[in-house]
Amino acid sequence: MTSENPDVLLSRVINVVRAASSLASQDVDFYKNLDRGFSKDLKSKADKLADMANEIILSIDEHHESFELKEEDISDLWNNFGNIMDNLLEMSDHSLDKLNCAINSKSRGSDLQYLGEFSGKNFSPTKRVEKPQLKFKSPIDNSESHPFIPLLKEKPNALKPLSESLRLVDDDENNPSHYPHPYEYEIDHQEYSPEILQIREEIPSKSWDDSVPIWVDTSTELESMLEDLKNTKEIAVDLEHHDYRSYYGIVCLMQISTRERDYLVDTLKLRENLHILNEVFTNPSIVKVFHGAFMDIIWLQRDLGLYVVGLFDTYHASKAIGLPRHSLAYLLENFANFKTSKKYQLADWRIRPLSKPMTAYARADTHFLLNIYDQLRNKLIESNKLAGVLYESRNVAKRRFEYSKYRPLTPSSEVYSPIEKESPWKILMYQYNIPPEREVLVRELYQWRDLIARRDDESPRFVMPNQLLAALVAYTPTDVIGVVSLTNGVTEHVRQNAKLLANLIRDALRNIKNTNEEATPIPSSETKADGILLETISVPQIRDVMERFSVLCNSNISKSRAKPVTNSSILLGKILPREEHDIAYSKDGLPNKVKTEDIRIRAQNFKSALANLEDIIFEIEKPLVVPVKLEEIKTVDPASAPNHSPEIDNLDDLVVLKKKNIQKKQPAKEKGVTEKDAVDYSKIPNILSNKPGQNNRQQKKRRFDPSSSDSNGPRAAKKRRPAAKGKNLSFKR
């Protein structure tokens, strides 16, 4: 295919898309009904497109059903076809990416090398391993009775003496008492090797197949390796860690590679002797290359007492360069043409001897790392980004381990603790959607699990997985059978402590119930008409109100019983030499003394003046009472009273079918008697309050509201009875 063909194909595809879009915007059915020829052409084109779609689908799957064009399901049909085409295009892109990767690997002059596949007959992931902690000379202490003490016995390459570096720092607002990082001053003030600042030719790694790793598990082999490391300028280091059968975790294996050799160090067997490697690890003239040393630095100082000065972290280098991914597997594949496998990343590295695939996997982590370091260093120097990577590497090297009990109150990247949250069980509540009212039960189970894990040096998830803890909170079994038969994943620790856990759950539920009852508010007696409470008060609030009320009552009683102040005493007689007097001011503004006797005289004069006052009688006008004239009740003679008994019809009378409605005249009223209608003045409008022109306005007619409570609709128009046609007839029966 020439370079011009893709452009021609693209232009044709664009024209097809434009034509289809313009056709879709028209009323095709309307034109089909108008023109028979257009309808035939359109149907033939649609059938041709359906045949092409069926050919494409049948070429992928011979058993796939063919598409049939039907107007009722054409949208679903083409949606399915579009999904199939999307999958085909994605597969094409994936194949093109593979082809480009193959071309790039060939252009580099070497094929991609793979980690060997092994049968794994001598590796059993389910095999029970004896806990190596039982053989340690220094027993594991998980009590956290004191801050973490560095395991340094001596301090090589020191700028500050060991005694000064291991002084306990007093607690402050954010940090409890702790021991500082013993090599923090050296990491900040010692310079890197001058060779790391220069662009140098890349040194290729030794052949993978021609070299064999050296296993180090004795003191003699350790000292021999140490002498070899002292004569190097760069070393690559990595660790394998296990944290499932240990509370804090243990370092199981250390991989160290030089330009010539690969070492695999048994850190379980040489745990007490590896501190001598500080002579190399703290030497700033030897570059220590790690990848992602974020946790490796913590594990080295916690288990082995090792610290790193002169760290180069390839993880931060890959980020500074701007690589799409920053994993070690990506660096191995793109910079060393080596395809590793993460199959054994989470394997149990405590087993001895190591299987062949585990040995190969551990060796691959550091075998190519120095060559990758050469390539990344040159790229960083060319882009002027090396200083930033060294700064980040220093910060990683200054990280220190601290027990959870003595962690800083404010989380910091410089300090690592196994538990960094104040209430870690709340994370489980969020993950498993546990209601807040069961937080007490979650906390009790979490603390019990943590206590057992510390005692037996097991991980909390080994004692009781999070799923099992959430199930206990959800189902709350309160007997042994309920705890044991809760799920299939009941651990040995839970099975052995089933009775204790059942009692713990029962007590926690009782505490939750009591807490809820105490926190339930007592409603007041004041309620609205619809039953809604106006106010709610709790028991402590009632007690507070009662105490305040009693204080007020006592204070009022004491005030009422208080005697007035006098100028004499029962025992000593009259104390004050002068009489009591008040002060009055004259018109001139000068004060004059007013004695008590004067006040008494004034009071007597006031009383006598009140007695001489005449009583004034106010007459209240009574409303005018109009006498009501009652009509005289006339007695009627029973003889002259009309008879209302039904009369018997006479058969000889005439029956009139229609009769004129002639109203009888009312008898004239007696002269001299005038009858007036009563007037209701409350309904008469006030003339003075009316606005001008208001009476001229027409009143609005009352409209019928169908949604009102009054269900009576407007009355229909009154119909007139049709007049009888013909003559009026009368006949005899």
UniProtKB/Swiss-Prot annotation:
Residues found modified as Phosphothreonine: T520
SUPFAM superfamilies (UniProt xref): HRDC-like, Ribonuclease H-like
Family recorded in the similarity comment: Belongs to the exosome component 10/RRP6 family.
Principal EC category: hydrolase
A molecular function (GO) term: rRNA primary transcript binding
Compositionally biased tracts (Basic residues): 716-733
SMART domains: 35EXOc, HRDC
Annotated phenotype, changing Y361A: Temperature-sensitive mutant. Abolishes exonuclease activity and increases accumulation of 5.8S + 30 nt RNA, 5' ETS RNA and U24 + 3 nt RNA
Tree of life domain: Eukaryota
Subunit structure: Component of the RNA exosome complex. Specifically part of the catalytically inactive RNA exosome core complex (Exo-9) which may associate with the catalytic subunits RRP6 and DIS3 in cytoplasmic- and nuclear-specific RNA exosome complex forms. Exo-9 is formed by a hexameric base ring of RNase PH domain-containing subunits and a cap ring consisting of CSL4, RRP4 and RRP40. RRP6 specifically is part of the nuclear form of the RNA exosome complex; the association appears to be mediated by Exo-9 and not by DIS3. Interacts with LRP1. Interacts with NPL3, NOP53 and PAP1.
Effect of disrupting the coding gene: Deletion mutant is temperature-sensitive. Impaired growth at 37 degrees Celsius. Impaired growth at all temperatures, nonviable at 37 degrees Celsius. Mutant is defective in the 3' processing of the 5.8S rRNA and accumulates a discrete species, 5.8S + 30, that is 3' extended by 30 nucleotides. Accumulates 7S RNA. Accumulates 5' external transcribed spacer (ETS) RNA. Accumulates extended forms of snR40 small nucleolar RNA (snoRNA). Accumulates U24 + 3 snoRNA. Accumulates poly(A)+ snoRNAs.
Binding positions (AMP): E240, H241, W299, K342, Q345
Annotated residues for binding of UMP: E240, H241, W299, K342, Q345
Task of the protein: Nuclear-specific catalytic component of the RNA exosome complex which has 3'->5' exoribonuclease activity and participates in a multitude of cellular RNA processing and degradation events. In the nucleus, the RNA exosome complex is involved in proper maturation of stable RNA species such as rRNA, snRNA and snoRNA, in the elimination of RNA processing by-products and non-coding 'pervasive' transcripts, such as antisense RNA species and cryptic unstable transcripts (CUTs), and of mRNAs with processing defects, thereby limiting or excluding their export to the cytoplasm.
First-listed, main subcellular location of the protein, grouped into a coarse class: nucleus
Residues binding Mn(2+) 2, per UniProt: E240, D365
Region (Disordered): 662-733
Chain intervals with Polar residues compositional bias: 687-697
Name the UniProt record assigns to this protein: Exosome complex exonuclease RRP6
Residues bound to Zn(2+): D238, E240, D365
GO cellular component, one term: nuclear exosome (RNase complex)
PANTHER family: EXOSOME COMPONENT 10, POLYMYOSITIS/SCLERODERMA AUTOANTIGEN-RELATED
EC number(s) recorded for this UniProt protein: 3.1.13.-
In-chain residues carrying the UniProt-annotated modification Phosphoserine: S138, S640, S645
PROSITE patterns (alphabetical): HRDC
Sequence motif Nuclear localization signal, residues: 700-704, 718-721
